[in-house]
Amino acid sequence: MEYRIERDTLGEIKVPADKLWAAQTQRSKENFPIGTEQMPLEIVKAFAILKKSAALSNQKLGKLSEEKAEAIVVAADEIIAGKWNEHFPLVVWQTGSGTQSNMNVNEVIANRGNQILKEKGSDVHIHPNDDVNMSQSSNDTFPTALHVACVLAVENHVLPAITKLKETLAEKVTAFEHIIKIGRTHLQDATPLTLGQEISGWHRMLEKTERMIAESNTYMKELAIGGTAVGTGINAHPKFGEMVSEEISQFTGKQFISAPNKFHALTSHDEVVYTHGALKALAADLMKIANDVRWLASGPRSGLGEIIIPANEPGSSIMPGKVNPTQSEALTMVVAQVMGNDATIGFAASQGNFELNVFKPVIAYNFLQSAHLLADAIVSFNDNCAVGIEADEEIIKENVNRSLMLVTALNPHIGYENAAKIAKHAHKEGLTLKEAALQSGLLTEEQFNEIVDPKKMIAPKE
Protein backbone atom coordinates (compact mmCIF):
# COMPACT_ATOMS: atom_id res chain seq x y z
CA MET A 1 0.00 0.00 0.00
CA GLU A 2 1.22 3.46 -0.86
CA TYR A 3 1.10 6.26 1.70
CA ARG A 4 1.34 10.02 1.80
CA ILE A 5 2.42 12.17 4.74
CA GLU A 6 -0.21 14.35 6.41
CA ARG A 7 0.44 16.83 9.21
CA ASP A 8 -1.55 18.21 12.12
CA THR A 9 -0.68 19.90 15.42
CA LEU A 10 0.80 16.64 16.73
CA GLY A 11 3.15 16.22 13.78
CA GLU A 12 3.38 13.92 10.78
CA ILE A 13 1.43 10.72 10.15
CA LYS A 14 1.17 8.28 7.24
CA VAL A 15 -2.21 8.12 5.47
CA PRO A 16 -3.15 5.68 2.66
CA ALA A 17 -2.46 7.53 -0.58
CA ASP A 18 -5.82 6.65 -2.13
CA LYS A 19 -7.94 7.95 0.78
CA LEU A 20 -9.43 11.41 1.08
CA TRP A 21 -9.17 11.59 4.86
CA ALA A 22 -6.19 13.22 6.55
CA ALA A 23 -4.24 13.26 9.80
CA GLN A 24 -6.96 13.46 12.45
CA THR A 25 -9.04 10.71 10.88
CA GLN A 26 -5.97 8.50 10.60
CA ARG A 27 -5.06 9.09 14.24
CA SER A 28 -8.58 8.16 15.32
CA LYS A 29 -8.47 5.03 13.17
CA GLU A 30 -5.23 3.98 14.85
CA ASN A 31 -6.11 5.08 18.38
CA PHE A 32 -9.56 3.47 18.62
CA PRO A 33 -9.36 -0.11 17.32
CA ILE A 34 -12.59 -0.90 19.18
CA GLY A 35 -15.40 -3.06 17.84
CA THR A 36 -16.86 -3.14 14.36
CA GLU A 37 -19.68 -0.62 14.82
CA GLN A 38 -18.91 2.12 12.32
CA MET A 39 -20.34 5.60 12.55
CA PRO A 40 -23.64 5.33 10.63
CA LEU A 41 -23.49 6.72 7.12
CA GLU A 42 -26.69 8.64 7.92
CA ILE A 43 -24.61 10.72 10.33
CA VAL A 44 -21.94 11.24 7.68
CA LYS A 45 -24.53 12.36 5.13
CA ALA A 46 -26.21 14.62 7.70
CA PHE A 47 -22.79 16.14 8.34
CA ALA A 48 -22.40 16.72 4.61
CA ILE A 49 -25.76 18.48 4.49
CA LEU A 50 -24.60 20.61 7.42
CA LYS A 51 -21.20 21.45 5.88
CA LYS A 52 -22.86 22.40 2.62
CA SER A 53 -25.32 24.62 4.47
CA ALA A 54 -22.56 26.17 6.58
CA ALA A 55 -20.45 26.97 3.51
CA LEU A 56 -23.33 28.72 1.77
CA SER A 57 -24.18 30.64 4.94
CA ASN A 58 -20.58 31.72 5.49
CA GLN A 59 -20.40 32.81 1.86
CA LYS A 60 -23.55 34.94 2.26
CA LEU A 61 -22.04 36.46 5.40
CA GLY A 62 -18.90 37.39 3.46
CA LYS A 63 -16.65 35.06 5.44
CA LEU A 64 -15.98 32.42 2.75
CA SER A 65 -15.15 32.99 -0.90
CA GLU A 66 -17.60 31.88 -3.57
CA GLU A 67 -14.91 29.67 -5.14
CA LYS A 68 -14.31 27.76 -1.91
CA ALA A 69 -18.01 27.54 -1.08
CA GLU A 70 -18.84 26.07 -4.48
CA ALA A 71 -16.14 23.41 -4.16
CA ILE A 72 -17.30 22.51 -0.64
CA VAL A 73 -20.90 22.20 -1.88
CA VAL A 74 -19.90 19.90 -4.75
CA ALA A 75 -17.82 17.69 -2.45
CA ALA A 76 -20.63 17.56 0.11
CA ASP A 77 -23.16 16.63 -2.57
CA GLU A 78 -20.93 13.76 -3.66
CA ILE A 79 -20.84 12.49 -0.06
CA ILE A 80 -24.62 12.76 0.21
CA ALA A 81 -24.91 10.73 -3.01
CA GLY A 82 -22.76 7.99 -1.43
CA LYS A 83 -19.78 8.43 -3.74
CA TRP A 84 -17.17 8.40 -0.97
CA ASN A 85 -18.64 6.01 1.61
CA GLU A 86 -15.41 4.05 2.00
CA HIS A 87 -13.63 7.21 3.10
CA PHE A 88 -15.50 7.28 6.43
CA PRO A 89 -13.93 4.39 8.36
CA LEU A 90 -14.28 5.52 11.97
CA VAL A 91 -16.05 3.51 14.63
CA VAL A 92 -18.62 4.75 17.11
CA TRP A 93 -16.22 4.16 20.00
CA GLN A 94 -14.25 7.41 19.82
CA THR A 95 -14.39 10.73 21.61
CA GLY A 96 -17.82 11.30 23.10
CA SER A 97 -18.27 14.60 21.29
CA GLY A 98 -17.82 12.95 17.91
CA THR A 99 -14.89 15.24 17.11
CA GLN A 100 -13.08 12.65 15.01
CA SER A 101 -16.13 12.06 12.83
CA ASN A 102 -16.60 15.80 12.39
CA MET A 103 -12.97 16.07 11.32
CA ASN A 104 -13.30 13.02 9.07
CA VAL A 105 -16.02 14.86 7.15
CA ASN A 106 -14.05 18.12 7.20
CA GLU A 107 -10.94 16.41 5.84
CA VAL A 108 -12.70 14.49 3.09
CA ILE A 109 -14.59 17.58 1.94
CA ALA A 110 -11.41 19.69 2.04
CA ASN A 111 -9.32 17.18 0.09
CA ARG A 112 -12.06 16.48 -2.43
CA GLY A 113 -12.75 20.21 -2.71
CA ASN A 114 -9.08 20.84 -3.44
CA GLN A 115 -9.17 18.18 -6.16
CA ILE A 116 -12.17 19.94 -7.71
CA LEU A 117 -10.41 23.31 -7.58
CA LYS A 118 -7.22 21.84 -9.04
CA GLU A 119 -9.19 20.32 -11.92
CA LYS A 120 -10.43 23.84 -12.66
CA GLY A 121 -6.89 25.18 -12.66
CA SER A 122 -7.28 27.05 -9.37
CA ASP A 123 -4.49 27.32 -6.82
CA VAL A 124 -6.94 28.16 -3.99
CA HIS A 125 -6.59 25.77 -1.05
CA ILE A 126 -9.45 24.66 1.22
CA HIS A 127 -8.51 23.98 4.85
CA PRO A 128 -10.57 21.43 6.85
CA ASN A 129 -10.72 23.62 9.97
CA ASP A 130 -10.49 27.17 8.67
CA ASP A 131 -12.90 26.71 5.76
CA VAL A 132 -15.05 23.56 6.03
CA ASN A 133 -15.42 23.90 9.81
CA MET A 134 -15.69 27.71 9.75
CA SER A 135 -17.99 29.11 12.48
CA GLN A 136 -18.41 25.61 13.89
CA SER A 137 -17.27 23.28 16.64
CA SER A 138 -17.66 19.52 16.93
CA ASN A 139 -19.75 20.35 19.99
CA ASP A 140 -22.51 21.95 17.91
CA THR A 141 -22.05 20.11 14.61
CA PHE A 142 -22.39 16.57 15.94
CA PRO A 143 -25.70 17.19 17.76
CA THR A 144 -26.92 19.00 14.65
CA ALA A 145 -26.03 16.07 12.40
CA LEU A 146 -27.55 13.73 14.99
CA HIS A 147 -30.89 15.53 14.91
CA VAL A 148 -30.96 15.79 11.12
CA ALA A 149 -30.16 12.08 10.69
CA CYS A 150 -32.72 10.98 13.28
CA VAL A 151 -35.50 13.17 11.89
CA LEU A 152 -34.89 11.85 8.38
CA ALA A 153 -34.80 8.23 9.59
CA VAL A 154 -38.10 8.61 11.43
CA GLU A 155 -39.98 10.54 8.76
CA ASN A 156 -38.58 8.75 5.71
CA HIS A 157 -38.52 5.20 7.05
CA VAL A 158 -40.36 4.54 10.31
CA LEU A 159 -43.57 6.49 9.68
CA PRO A 160 -44.10 5.13 6.13
CA ALA A 161 -43.60 1.58 7.45
CA ILE A 162 -46.25 2.14 10.14
CA THR A 163 -48.65 3.48 7.51
CA LYS A 164 -48.15 0.37 5.41
CA LEU A 165 -48.96 -2.04 8.25
CA LYS A 166 -51.86 0.15 9.37
CA GLU A 167 -53.43 -0.13 5.93
CA THR A 168 -53.09 -3.91 5.95
CA LEU A 169 -54.68 -4.20 9.39
CA ALA A 170 -57.53 -1.90 8.34
CA GLU A 171 -58.27 -4.30 5.49
CA LYS A 172 -58.27 -7.25 7.90
CA VAL A 173 -60.64 -5.42 10.27
CA THR A 174 -63.18 -5.17 7.45
CA ALA A 175 -62.56 -8.68 6.12
CA PHE A 176 -63.04 -10.29 9.54
CA GLU A 177 -65.77 -8.06 10.99
CA HIS A 178 -68.38 -10.85 10.74
CA ILE A 179 -66.31 -13.61 12.37
CA ILE A 180 -67.24 -14.05 16.03
CA LYS A 181 -64.51 -15.59 18.16
CA ILE A 182 -63.89 -16.17 21.82
CA GLY A 183 -62.02 -13.42 23.63
CA ARG A 184 -59.21 -14.15 26.04
CA THR A 185 -57.97 -12.33 29.14
CA HIS A 186 -55.18 -13.62 31.40
CA LEU A 187 -54.68 -16.25 28.64
CA GLN A 188 -58.05 -17.70 29.70
CA ASP A 189 -61.37 -17.79 27.86
CA ALA A 190 -63.45 -14.61 28.09
CA THR A 191 -66.54 -13.23 26.37
CA PRO A 192 -66.84 -13.14 22.56
CA LEU A 193 -65.80 -10.45 20.13
CA THR A 194 -65.21 -10.43 16.40
CA LEU A 195 -61.82 -11.11 14.89
CA GLY A 196 -62.21 -7.72 13.23
CA GLN A 197 -62.69 -6.06 16.61
CA GLU A 198 -59.58 -7.77 17.96
CA ILE A 199 -57.48 -6.57 15.03
CA SER A 200 -58.99 -3.08 15.30
CA GLY A 201 -57.18 -2.85 18.64
CA TRP A 202 -53.90 -3.53 16.87
CA HIS A 203 -54.75 -0.91 14.25
CA ARG A 204 -55.49 1.68 16.93
CA MET A 205 -52.14 0.99 18.61
CA LEU A 206 -50.35 1.91 15.41
CA GLU A 207 -52.49 5.01 14.94
CA LYS A 208 -51.57 6.28 18.39
CA THR A 209 -47.87 5.46 18.34
CA GLU A 210 -47.60 6.96 14.86
CA ARG A 211 -48.89 10.25 16.26
CA MET A 212 -46.64 10.01 19.33
CA ILE A 213 -43.57 9.50 17.16
CA ALA A 214 -44.49 12.32 14.78
CA GLU A 215 -45.14 14.71 17.67
CA SER A 216 -41.95 13.85 19.54
CA ASN A 217 -39.93 14.14 16.34
CA THR A 218 -40.76 17.85 16.12
CA TYR A 219 -38.54 18.51 19.14
CA MET A 220 -35.53 17.11 17.27
CA LYS A 221 -35.99 19.74 14.59
CA GLU A 222 -34.25 22.23 16.88
CA LEU A 223 -30.58 22.41 15.85
CA ALA A 224 -27.51 23.17 17.97
CA ILE A 225 -25.55 24.78 15.15
CA GLY A 226 -24.42 28.29 16.05
CA GLY A 227 -23.58 27.35 19.63
CA THR A 228 -19.97 26.44 18.73
CA ALA A 229 -17.85 25.30 21.71
CA VAL A 230 -19.99 25.81 24.83
CA GLY A 231 -23.18 27.43 23.55
CA THR A 232 -22.05 31.06 23.50
CA GLY A 233 -21.54 31.12 19.73
CA ILE A 234 -17.93 32.25 19.92
CA ASN A 235 -16.35 32.65 16.44
CA ALA A 236 -19.74 32.46 14.71
CA HIS A 237 -21.90 35.24 13.29
CA PRO A 238 -25.06 35.91 15.38
CA LYS A 239 -27.26 34.93 12.41
CA PHE A 240 -25.21 31.85 11.49
CA GLY A 241 -27.35 29.29 13.35
CA GLU A 242 -30.59 30.55 11.83
CA MET A 243 -29.13 30.76 8.34
CA VAL A 244 -27.71 27.24 8.45
CA SER A 245 -30.99 25.86 9.82
CA GLU A 246 -32.85 27.48 6.91
CA GLU A 247 -30.43 25.98 4.39
CA ILE A 248 -30.78 22.52 5.96
CA SER A 249 -34.56 22.86 5.83
CA GLN A 250 -34.39 23.71 2.14
CA PHE A 251 -32.14 20.75 1.31
CA THR A 252 -34.07 18.17 3.34
CA GLY A 253 -37.64 19.37 2.92
CA LYS A 254 -38.03 19.24 6.72
CA GLN A 255 -38.65 22.33 8.82
CA PHE A 256 -35.61 22.68 11.07
CA ILE A 257 -35.04 25.70 13.32
CA SER A 258 -32.13 27.08 15.29
CA ALA A 259 -32.37 25.91 18.91
CA PRO A 260 -33.42 28.89 21.08
CA ASN A 261 -31.00 27.89 23.85
CA LYS A 262 -27.68 26.55 22.64
CA PHE A 263 -26.44 25.70 26.15
CA HIS A 264 -29.26 23.17 26.38
CA ALA A 265 -28.65 21.94 22.83
CA LEU A 266 -25.02 21.01 23.51
CA THR A 267 -25.35 19.33 26.88
CA SER A 268 -28.80 17.71 26.77
CA HIS A 269 -30.25 15.10 24.47
CA ASP A 270 -33.69 14.92 26.06
CA GLU A 271 -35.33 15.30 22.63
CA VAL A 272 -33.65 12.10 21.46
CA VAL A 273 -34.70 10.30 24.65
CA TYR A 274 -38.28 11.48 24.13
CA THR A 275 -38.47 10.43 20.49
CA HIS A 276 -36.80 7.10 21.13
CA GLY A 277 -39.29 6.61 23.95
CA ALA A 278 -42.03 6.92 21.34
CA LEU A 279 -40.20 4.34 19.23
CA LYS A 280 -40.13 2.11 22.32
CA ALA A 281 -43.90 2.56 22.67
CA LEU A 282 -44.24 1.41 19.07
CA ALA A 283 -41.96 -1.53 19.84
CA ALA A 284 -44.09 -2.51 22.84
CA ASP A 285 -47.21 -2.54 20.66
CA LEU A 286 -45.43 -4.53 17.96
CA MET A 287 -44.43 -7.12 20.56
CA LYS A 288 -48.09 -7.51 21.50
CA ILE A 289 -49.24 -7.77 17.89
CA ALA A 290 -46.52 -10.25 16.93
CA ASN A 291 -47.25 -12.40 19.98
CA ASP A 292 -51.00 -12.38 19.34
CA VAL A 293 -50.40 -13.47 15.77
CA ARG A 294 -48.12 -16.36 16.67
CA TRP A 295 -50.34 -17.59 19.49
CA LEU A 296 -53.52 -17.33 17.43
CA ALA A 297 -51.73 -19.26 14.67
CA SER A 298 -50.39 -21.93 17.03
CA GLY A 299 -51.06 -25.54 16.16
CA PRO A 300 -52.11 -26.68 13.68
CA ARG A 301 -53.84 -29.38 15.75
CA SER A 302 -52.71 -28.88 19.32
CA GLY A 303 -52.82 -25.09 19.55
CA LEU A 304 -55.37 -22.34 19.07
CA GLY A 305 -55.19 -22.38 15.29
CA GLU A 306 -57.73 -19.59 14.85
CA ILE A 307 -55.74 -17.84 12.16
CA ILE A 308 -53.55 -19.17 9.36
CA ILE A 309 -50.28 -17.41 8.51
CA PRO A 310 -48.26 -17.75 5.29
CA ALA A 311 -45.73 -20.56 5.07
CA ASN A 312 -42.60 -18.67 4.04
CA GLU A 313 -40.06 -21.42 4.64
CA PRO A 314 -39.81 -24.93 6.16
CA GLY A 315 -40.36 -24.60 9.88
CA SER A 316 -38.02 -27.25 11.20
CA SER A 317 -34.87 -29.08 10.23
CA ILE A 318 -36.13 -32.24 11.97
CA MET A 319 -39.95 -32.04 12.06
CA PRO A 320 -41.53 -32.06 8.58
CA GLY A 321 -44.62 -30.00 7.87
CA LYS A 322 -44.15 -27.31 10.52
CA VAL A 323 -45.04 -23.71 9.71
CA ASN A 324 -43.31 -21.51 12.25
CA PRO A 325 -44.25 -17.87 12.94
CA THR A 326 -40.86 -16.66 11.79
CA GLN A 327 -41.90 -13.10 10.99
CA SER A 328 -43.31 -12.70 14.49
CA GLU A 329 -40.10 -14.07 15.94
CA ALA A 330 -37.93 -11.71 13.92
CA LEU A 331 -40.10 -8.75 14.88
CA THR A 332 -40.01 -9.61 18.58
CA MET A 333 -36.22 -9.87 18.49
CA VAL A 334 -36.09 -6.40 16.96
CA VAL A 335 -38.30 -5.19 19.79
CA ALA A 336 -35.87 -6.66 22.33
CA GLN A 337 -33.01 -4.79 20.66
CA VAL A 338 -34.95 -1.53 20.66
CA MET A 339 -35.71 -1.93 24.37
CA GLY A 340 -32.00 -2.36 25.04
CA ASN A 341 -31.14 0.61 22.86
CA ASP A 342 -33.60 2.72 24.82
CA ALA A 343 -31.81 1.90 28.07
CA THR A 344 -28.48 2.86 26.50
CA ILE A 345 -29.82 6.13 25.09
CA GLY A 346 -31.45 7.08 28.38
CA PHE A 347 -28.26 6.54 30.35
CA ALA A 348 -26.03 8.18 27.73
CA ALA A 349 -28.27 11.24 27.59
CA SER A 350 -27.98 11.65 31.36
CA GLN A 351 -24.24 12.25 31.05
CA GLY A 352 -24.33 15.93 30.10
CA ASN A 353 -21.64 17.16 32.44
CA PHE A 354 -21.43 20.96 32.59
CA GLU A 355 -21.55 22.34 29.01
CA LEU A 356 -21.30 19.14 26.95
CA ASN A 357 -22.68 15.64 26.74
CA VAL A 358 -19.89 13.30 25.68
CA PHE A 359 -21.90 10.18 24.83
CA LYS A 360 -23.14 11.51 21.49
CA PRO A 361 -21.87 8.78 19.11
CA VAL A 362 -23.48 5.91 21.04
CA ILE A 363 -26.75 7.85 21.20
CA ALA A 364 -26.64 8.32 17.43
CA TYR A 365 -25.76 4.69 16.72
CA ASN A 366 -28.49 3.23 18.90
CA PHE A 367 -31.24 5.60 17.78
CA LEU A 368 -30.56 5.01 14.10
CA GLN A 369 -30.29 1.27 14.62
CA SER A 370 -33.68 1.25 16.34
CA ALA A 371 -35.30 3.35 13.63
CA HIS A 372 -34.03 1.23 10.77
CA LEU A 373 -34.64 -2.11 12.49
CA LEU A 374 -38.21 -1.11 13.29
CA ALA A 375 -38.88 0.16 9.78
CA ASP A 376 -37.39 -2.93 8.14
CA ALA A 377 -39.07 -5.38 10.51
CA ILE A 378 -42.49 -3.74 10.17
CA VAL A 379 -42.33 -3.89 6.37
CA SER A 380 -41.12 -7.50 6.47
CA PHE A 381 -43.85 -8.51 8.93
CA ASN A 382 -46.44 -6.76 6.79
CA ASP A 383 -45.36 -8.15 3.43
CA ASN A 384 -44.52 -11.69 4.54
CA CYS A 385 -47.13 -12.27 7.24
CA ALA A 386 -49.88 -9.74 7.91
CA VAL A 387 -51.15 -9.43 4.34
CA GLY A 388 -51.57 -13.20 4.18
CA ILE A 389 -53.38 -13.77 7.48
CA GLU A 390 -56.54 -15.84 7.04
CA ALA A 391 -59.19 -16.92 9.54
CA ASP A 392 -59.96 -20.58 10.23
CA GLU A 393 -63.67 -20.04 10.74
CA GLU A 394 -64.37 -23.68 11.59
CA ILE A 395 -61.95 -23.74 14.52
CA ILE A 396 -63.08 -20.29 15.65
CA LYS A 397 -66.72 -21.40 15.70
CA GLU A 398 -65.85 -24.61 17.55
CA ASN A 399 -63.94 -22.65 20.20
CA VAL A 400 -66.89 -20.27 20.69
CA ASN A 401 -69.36 -23.12 21.09
CA ARG A 402 -67.15 -24.88 23.64
CA SER A 403 -66.48 -21.83 25.76
CA LEU A 404 -68.03 -21.64 29.21
CA MET A 405 -67.57 -17.87 29.32
CA LEU A 406 -70.72 -17.37 27.28
CA VAL A 407 -72.35 -17.83 30.68
CA THR A 408 -71.54 -14.15 31.31
CA ALA A 409 -74.63 -13.25 29.29
CA LEU A 410 -76.77 -14.92 31.98
CA ASN A 411 -75.54 -12.61 34.77
CA PRO A 412 -78.28 -9.96 34.36
CA HIS A 413 -80.97 -12.65 34.27
CA ILE A 414 -80.07 -15.19 36.98
CA GLY A 415 -77.29 -13.39 38.88
CA TYR A 416 -73.53 -13.83 39.01
CA GLU A 417 -73.51 -16.66 41.60
CA ASN A 418 -76.03 -18.81 39.76
CA ALA A 419 -74.23 -18.25 36.47
CA ALA A 420 -70.93 -19.25 38.09
CA LYS A 421 -72.51 -22.45 39.47
CA ILE A 422 -73.72 -23.38 35.99
CA ALA A 423 -70.26 -22.81 34.47
CA LYS A 424 -68.53 -24.83 37.20
CA HIS A 425 -71.04 -27.67 36.87
CA ALA A 426 -70.58 -27.78 33.11
CA HIS A 427 -66.80 -27.84 33.46
CA LYS A 428 -66.81 -30.52 36.18
CA GLU A 429 -69.26 -32.83 34.45
CA GLY A 430 -68.07 -32.28 30.90
CA LEU A 431 -71.39 -30.81 29.84
CA THR A 432 -72.16 -28.07 27.41
CA LEU A 433 -73.17 -24.77 28.93
CA LYS A 434 -76.68 -25.27 27.66
CA GLU A 435 -76.96 -28.73 29.21
CA ALA A 436 -75.76 -27.46 32.58
CA ALA A 437 -78.12 -24.46 32.45
CA LEU A 438 -81.14 -26.64 31.73
CA GLN A 439 -80.19 -29.05 34.54
CA SER A 440 -80.12 -26.13 36.95
CA GLY A 441 -83.81 -25.48 36.33
CA LEU A 442 -83.20 -21.74 36.26
CA LEU A 443 -83.82 -21.38 32.53
CA THR A 444 -85.88 -22.93 29.78
CA GLU A 445 -84.26 -23.95 26.52
CA GLU A 446 -86.03 -21.09 24.77
CA GLN A 447 -84.73 -18.58 27.31
CA PHE A 448 -81.20 -19.92 27.06
CA ASN A 449 -81.18 -19.73 23.26
CA GLU A 450 -82.49 -16.17 23.38
CA ILE A 451 -79.99 -14.94 25.95
CA VAL A 452 -76.82 -16.87 25.15
CA ASP A 453 -76.35 -15.72 21.57
CA PRO A 454 -72.76 -14.73 20.70
CA LYS A 455 -74.04 -12.25 18.12
CA LYS A 456 -75.69 -10.29 20.92
CA MET A 457 -72.56 -10.31 23.07
CA ILE A 458 -70.14 -8.31 20.92
CA ALA A 459 -71.42 -4.79 21.64
CA PRO A 460 -73.09 -2.88 24.48
CA LYS A 461 -76.88 -2.68 24.50
CA GLU A 462 -79.46 -0.59 26.32
Swiss-Prot record:
GO terms for molecular function: fumarate hydratase activity. Substrate binds at residues 97-99, 127-130, 137-139, 185, 317, 322-324. It holds the Pfam family FumaraseC_C. It is an enzyme of class 4 (lyase). The record marks 329 as: Important for catalytic activity. Its EC number is 4.2.1.2. GO terms for cellular component: cytoplasm. Keywords: Cytoplasm, Lyase, Tricarboxylic acid cycle. Pathway: Carbohydrate metabolism; tricarboxylic acid cycle; (S)-malate from fumarate: step 1/1. Signal peptide: none annotated. The active site is at 186 (proton donor/acceptor), 316. It is found in: Cytoplasm. It catalyses: (S)-malate = fumarate + H2O. Its main location: cytoplasm. One of its GO terms (biological process) is tricarboxylic acid cycle. HAMAP family: FumaraseC (MF_00743). Belongs to the class-II fumarase/aspartase family. Fumarase subfamily. There are 2 substrate-binding sites: the catalytic A site, and the non-catalytic B site that may play a role in the transfer of substrate or product between the active site and the solvent. Alternatively, the B site may bind allosteric effectors. Homotetramer. Involved in the TCA cycle. Catalyzes the stereospecific interconversion of fumarate to L-malate. This is Fumarate hydratase class II. It comes from Bacillus anthracis. The gene is fumC.
